[in-house]
UniProtKB/Swiss-Prot annotation:
One term of GO molecular function: beta-lactamase activity
Signal sequence annotation: 1-21
Protein name according to UniProt: Beta-lactamase
One of the Pfam families matching this protein, by short name: Beta-lactamase
InterPro entries (UniProt xref): Bact_CellWall_Synth/Modif, Beta-lactam-related, Beta-lactam/transpept-like, Beta-lactam_class-C_AS
Name of encoding gene: ampC
Other noteworthy facts: The class C beta-lactamase family has a specific amino-acid numbering system known as SANC, for structural alignment-based numbering of class C beta-lactamases, or else the simpler name structural position. A multiple sequence alignment was used to derive a consensus sequence and then the consensus was numbered taking into account insertions and deletions. This allows use of identical numbers, e.g. for active site residues, despite differences in protein length.
UniProt superkingdom: Bacteria
One GO CC annotation: outer membrane-bounded periplasmic space
Entry keywords, A to Z: Antibiotic resistance, Hydrolase, Periplasm, Signal
Annotated EC: 3.5.2.6
Binding site for substrate: 328-330
GO annotation, biological process: antibiotic catabolic process; response to antibiotic
């Protein structure tokens, strides 16, 4: 090592701990009041700037045991799982197993001759199939699910409305796994996740990892974990830790090495809502950056999830928006998640909590953290 290189290494060794401490103070100022406001037992905040990752753990994984949150603590990520399912479909497409242009009925013989002759995989991947949000309560097995799909009739033409849908992304996950000739969980855990280098991300948490699985808490402080049900794995089934999830965001920023089959990421513009709040990509939502906090809150509020919004296809699809705020919320009964990355800034933030609290507060917290990161 030359004298100049030794000096550079010494300077870096002195600067990095100071920068980390300053970043910790910025994040403390945002997260500690938020945890107090909602009585959140534990959180993990993962930050990446130019590929340099830091994990900031807060509180406990279980109020009963008092075990602290660490970077290995597993959280339910809720609907952030939908982005993994969309990525699995891209993973299958890269192997020439499917095409997003094809109708869903091309891959599912049980729904041929139904409304799905006119619903493309791209519609399923962008919440524009018209399918409703929830699987009906009386649908409890695959036969009943397929019967529901066969009988379903859309209220609007495919592509004309954005309707946030577990049923839509669930069908896409079924098709992606079928095209790979594997059960969904196997395709995810043994195929795509290893290709991403995510070794502590699961649909089914193995026995050896249960000690790392945080206890979730409902808004009224009851201990809860996600319940099994039709399309749960495809829609909201992922459990992961802060280290794996910030790697996932960095992969979207192309800041980490992944297997060659996993080098294209599902961020391409495909549909925009006429309300103008955001552009809908393959499960990720994006906003031109810089963006006002009020616009982010509008796009992530409950109304955008529960109510349909007119949508217009962008044709041809545009290149990815580098100056964009890409985000996705995720919730289960006892966990809260918010993920955001900004390609033009090479910044990513992942927020994980073992208690449910509103999206607005998650978005605002991440917004202030990113503002602080940009000032450093």
């Amino acid at each position: 090592m030359t004298k100049m290189n030794r000096c550079a290494a010494l300077i870096a060794a002195l600067i990095l701990p100071t920068a980390h401490a300053a970043q910790q103070q910025d994040i403390d100022a945002v997260i500690q009041p938020l945890m107090k406001k909602y009585g959140v037992p534990g959180m993990a905040i993962a930050v990446s700037v130019d590929g340099k990752q830091q994990i900031y753990p807060y509180g406990v994984a279980s109020k009963q045991t008092g075990k602290p949150i660490t970077e290995q603590t597993l959280f339910e990520v809720g609907s952030l799982s939908k982005t993994f399912t969309a990525t699995l479909a891209v993973y299958a497409q890269q192997q020439s197993k499917l095409s997003f242009k094809d109708p869903a009925s091309h891959y599912l013989p049980d729904v041929r001759g139904s409304a799905f002759d006119g619903v493309s995989l791209l519609n399923l991947a962008t919440h524009t199939s018209g399918l409703p949000l929830f699987v009906p309560d009386d649908v409890t097995n695959n036969a009943q699910l397929m019967a529901y799909y066969r009988a379903w009739q859309p209220k609007h033409p495919a592509g004309s409305y954005r309707v946030y849908s577990n049923l839509g992304i669930g069908m896409l996950g079924m098709i992606a796994a079928k095209s790979l000739d594997q059960p969904f969980i196997q395709a995810m855990e043994q195929g795509m996740l290893p290709a991403l280098g995510m070794s502590h991300t699961y649909v089914q948490v193995p026995a050896a990892q249960m000690a790392n699985y945080a206890q979730g808490y409902s808004k009224d402080d009851k201990p809860v974990r996600v319940n099994p049900g039709p399309l749960d794995a495809e829609s909201y089934g992922i459990k992961s830790n802060a280290r794996d999830l910030i790697r996932y965001l960095d992969a979207n920023l192309q800041q980490v090495k992944v297997a060659s089959v996993a080098r294209r990421w599902p961020r391409r513009t495909s549909v925009i809502t006429s309300a103008g709040a955001f552009t809908q990509d393959l499960m990720w939502e994006n906003y031109p950056y810089p963006v006002k906090l009020s616009r982010l809150i509008e796009g992530n509020n409950a109304g955008m999830i529960m109510n349909g919004t007119p949508a217009t296809a962008i044709t041809p699809p545009q290149p990815e928006l580098r100056a964009g705020w890409y985000n996705k919320t995720g919730s289960t009964g006892g966990f809260s998640t918010y993920a955001v990355f900004i390609p033009a800034k090479n910044i990513a933030v992942e927020m994980l909590a073992n208690k449910w609290f509103p999206n607005d507060d998650r978005v605002e917290a991440a917004y202030h953290i990113i503002q602080a990161l940009e000032k450093r």
